């Protein structure tokens, strides 16, 4: 008897070629539902509609098509269990040897502007996941394909193994099937959580899933295997970036690129550039042009910039490209790259050059693994509002000082705590990152700034527990400080600022970064 394949897909890419090979090369019979059956029929292929095979018509406007014992019995039957075979024979059910199914485009639907809840709900597949899970469960006896990218590999398996896919292939396909349904259900749960958020006090379940995008050479270190996963079915963020040149991206490249993106997303109105090393900015600056912004960022700490990750919020032009080629860089990302600039950058073929049109959109949550679970928090994407800042010293800020304070505050937000940033002329002069005491970070930032600290601004991501940081800053020539406040000894720091003639502004918002 000919083997039986069930084909029911929303994405019909490659389905005709697959079906033709199944029929002509391997003597499969085909059963199919809805639009897939029509597509096969239009292509001149012999196909039996699911409704004709089961004897039950599609009902509820197509909501029930494949949910039938003749379908699921054929999928779930164990060929090495006599009672299962007897049950099939008694109910005139043929065993199904191949299931090809992909799911309604739920994520694509909810991504459309103005889509209603009713429209979204109608794109929640029921029969598809049921078949996908059933066939994945029974991998010992049949194969399941849920992605057109699997079709050629499956056919090659049949050609090399006398018409039967290997157990290894079936196991991999089953794992992909379960991963696909998990990701699909996660997308639905997240979408409905957002939809129903007004009366959900909290989310009791949090599911994290993704599709493997790329195996990375290694993780942070060569002994750590690593993989890059994409969330959702539609590429977004770095999965949507275009690599114009250079080697494959590494784990550390991607981590640093994301750190660079977060900083550059703070600045939209003015050309901005940042250079990242080990997720911290060694130089960030604004300029009248993107070329000027990059040069200022580079000169802020040219030593640390070597081997850095550069992010720009404007297209790369020829002038900027020429500057970029003057030192060794790991990666450069910008919204786009002009043709002449690309020719210039090509002279440094090892530099990874990427374009990503949307550098401002990032994940809404951050997730960290801990022993026995993981932690989830909303992203620190609060927008700085200077109208809510409190000037706590006798000296009031000028408009220019307020703009500089805002720049320093935005950069400091993305430096590892304890974080101190010294700036002037919308350019970082010194960055103190990751120290175990705040005054230690102050000293590092001031040492980097050197003589340029005179007349500069200092930002701190957390409050000052003592007035020593204020006095150290004043001794180096700092004239204004922005910090969140909230210490029991705020009055000591404010008094020191007044005594030393400094301006101090409290934001009321802390930006720890661990």
UniProtKB/Swiss-Prot annotation:
GO CC annotation terms, alphabetical: cytosol
Xref: Gene3D superfamilies: 3.40.140.20, Methylglyoxal synthase-like domain (3.40.50.1380)
Gene this chain is encoded by: purH
Keywords, in A-Z order: Hydrolase, Multifunctional enzyme, Purine biosynthesis, Transferase
EC number in record: 2.1.2.3, 3.5.4.10
SMART domains on file: AICARFT_IMPCHas, MGS
One GO term of the biological process aspect: 'de novo' IMP biosynthetic process
The keyword Hydrolase is annotated on this UniProt entry: yes
This protein's name: Bifunctional purine biosynthesis protein PurH
Pathway: Purine metabolism; IMP biosynthesis via de novo pathway; 5-formamido-1-(5-phospho-D-ribosyl)imidazole-4-carboxamide from 5-amino-1-(5-phospho-D-ribosyl)imidazole-4-carboxamide (10-formyl THF route): step 1/1; Purine metabolism; IMP biosynthesis via de novo pathway; IMP from 5-formamido-1-(5-phospho-D-ribosyl)imidazole-4-carboxamide: step 1/1
Species: Nostoc punctiforme (strain ATCC 29133 / PCC 73102)
Chemical reaction(s) catalysed: (6R)-10-formyltetrahydrofolate + 5-amino-1-(5-phospho-beta-D-ribosyl)imidazole-4-carboxamide = 5-formamido-1-(5-phospho-D-ribosyl)imidazole-4-carboxamide + (6S)-5,6,7,8-tetrahydrofolate; IMP + H2O = 5-formamido-1-(5-phospho-D-ribosyl)imidazole-4-carboxamide
Annotated Pfam families: AICARFT_IMPCHas (PF01808), MGS (PF02142)
Residues covered by the MGS-like domain: 1-146
HAMAP family named among the record's database cross-references: PurH (MF_00139)
GO terms, molecular function: IMP cyclohydrolase activity; phosphoribosylaminoimidazolecarboxamide formyltransferase activity
């Amino acid at each position: 008897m000919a083997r039986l394949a069930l084909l029911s897909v929303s994405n019909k890419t490659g389905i005709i070629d697959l079906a033709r090979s199944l029929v002509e090369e391997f003597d499969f019979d085909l059963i199919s539902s809805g639009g897939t059956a029509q597509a096969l029929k239009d292509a001149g292929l012999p196909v039996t509609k699911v409704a004709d095979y089961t004897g039950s018509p599609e009902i509820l406007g197509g909501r029930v098509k494949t949910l039938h014992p003749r379908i699921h019995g054929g999928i779930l039957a164990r060929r090495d269990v006599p009672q299962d075979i007897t049950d099939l024979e008694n109910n005139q059910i043929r065993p199904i040897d191949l299931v090809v199914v992909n799911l309604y485009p739920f994520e694509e639907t909810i991504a459309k502007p103005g889509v209603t809840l009713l429209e979204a709900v109608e794109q929640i597949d029921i029969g598809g996941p049921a078949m996908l899970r059933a066939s994945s469960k029974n991998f010992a006896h049949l194969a399941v394909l849920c992605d057109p990218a699997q079709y050629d590999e499956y056919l090659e398996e049949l050609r090399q193994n006398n018409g039967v896919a290997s157990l290894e292939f079936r196991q991999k396909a089953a794992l992909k099937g379960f991963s696909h349904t998990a990701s699909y259900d996660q997308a639905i749960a997240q979408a409905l959580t957002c939809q129903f958020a007004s009366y959900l006090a909290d989310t009791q379940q949090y599911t994290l899933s993704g599709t493997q995008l790329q195996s990375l050479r290694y993780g942070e270190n060569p002994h750590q295997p690593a993989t890059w996963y994409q969330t959702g079915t539609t590429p977004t963020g770095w999965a949507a970036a275009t690599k114009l040149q250079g080697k494959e991206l590494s784990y550390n490249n991607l981590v640093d690129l994301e750190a660079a993106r977060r900083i550059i997303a703070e600045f939209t109105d003015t050309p901005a550039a940042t250079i990242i090393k080990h997720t911290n900015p060694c130089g960030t600056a604004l300029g009248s042009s993107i070329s000027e912004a990059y040069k200022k960022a580079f000169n802020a700490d040219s030593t640390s910039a070597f081997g850095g990750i550069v992010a720009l919020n404007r297209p790369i032009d020829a002038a900027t490209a020429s500057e970029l080629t003057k030192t060794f860089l790991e990666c450069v990302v910008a919204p786009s790259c002009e043709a002449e600039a690309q020719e210039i950058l090509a002279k440094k073929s090892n530099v990874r050059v990427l374009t990503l049109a949307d550098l401002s959109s990032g994940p809404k949550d951050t997730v960290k693994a801990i022993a026995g679970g993981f932690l989830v928090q909303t992203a620190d994407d609060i927008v700085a509002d200077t109208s809510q800042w409190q000037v706590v010293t006798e000296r009031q800020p000028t408009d220019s000082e307020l703009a500089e304070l805002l720049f320093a505050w935005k950069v400091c937000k993305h430096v590892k705590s304890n974080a101190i940033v010294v700036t002037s002329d919308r350019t970082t002069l010194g960055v103190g990152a990751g120290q175990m005491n705040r005054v230690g970070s102050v000293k590092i930032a001031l040492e980097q700034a050197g003589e340029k600290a005179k007349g500069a601004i200092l930002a701190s991501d957390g409050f000052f527990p003592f007035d020593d940081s204020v006095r150290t800053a004043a001794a180096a020539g700092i004239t204004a400080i922005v910090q969140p406040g909230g210490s029991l000894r705020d009055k000591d720091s404010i008094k020191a600022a007044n005594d030393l003639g400094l301006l101090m502004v409290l934001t009321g918002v802390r930006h720890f970064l661990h």
